């Protein structure tokens, strides 16, 4: 089965027209599961092969979040929390470590590795911290906002000599590029 990261990369390359039939099929499957007509599978077939159902649903949600960001549609708080957690999980799986901590209160925090040599943090407040609100993180993680724009506009607070390396780790899913932005 494909990892969350592999599925995310494939979805990043898809257009909304490519994803619509798959989303429709997934919604039908979810409806069948919720009405009890068939047992819920642990894995589903995706465009890139089999994946865990929960991972696939989370990435489908991320695609919906990206469409909302591109359209300027306000998202419910619960959706923002889930989207932040999912994107932070992918970021942690891709760049996990103990040098930089990215905080997105109240949704999540993730510890990341420096792209250069950096201190290995174990307890207490780490020396390299970046913190943003959920909207800013979603925009950064999906490519609708660059790191430099976020810094210039005071939308992210940072401390430590390695925290600027986060710019190299973002976006997690470049949906803005796919939307022509």
Q: Where are the regions a protein language model picked out?
A:
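C-terminal interaction segments
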Residues: 1-20, 122-181
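Acidic, aliphatic-rich amphipathic alpha-helical segments
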Residues: 10-110, 163-164, 169-181
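Glycine/small-residue-rich hydrophobic helix-like segments
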Residues: 96-135
């Amino acid at each position: 089965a494909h990892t969350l990261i592999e599925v995310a990369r494939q979805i990043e390359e898809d257009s909304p027209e490519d994803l619509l039939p798959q989303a429709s099929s997934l919604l039908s499957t979810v409806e069948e599961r919720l009405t009890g007509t068939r047992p819920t599978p642990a894995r589903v077939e995706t465009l890139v092969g089999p994946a865990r159902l929960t991972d696939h649903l989370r990435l489908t949600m991320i695609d919906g979040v990206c469409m909302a960001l591109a359209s300027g549609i306000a998202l419910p708080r619960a959706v923002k929390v889930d989207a932040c957690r999912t994107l932070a999980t992918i970021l942690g799986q891709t760049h996990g470590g103990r040098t930089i901590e990215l905080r997105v209160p109240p949704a999540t925090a993730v510890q990341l590795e420096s792209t250069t040599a950096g201190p290995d943090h174990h307890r207490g407040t780490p020396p390299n911290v970046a913190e943003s609100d959920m909207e800013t993180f979603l925009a950064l993680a999906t490519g609708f906002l660059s790191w430099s724009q976020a810094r210039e506009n005071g939308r992210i607070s940072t401390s430590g000599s390695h925290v600027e390396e986060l710019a190299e780790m973002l976006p997690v899913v470049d949906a803005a590029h796919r939307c022509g932005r």
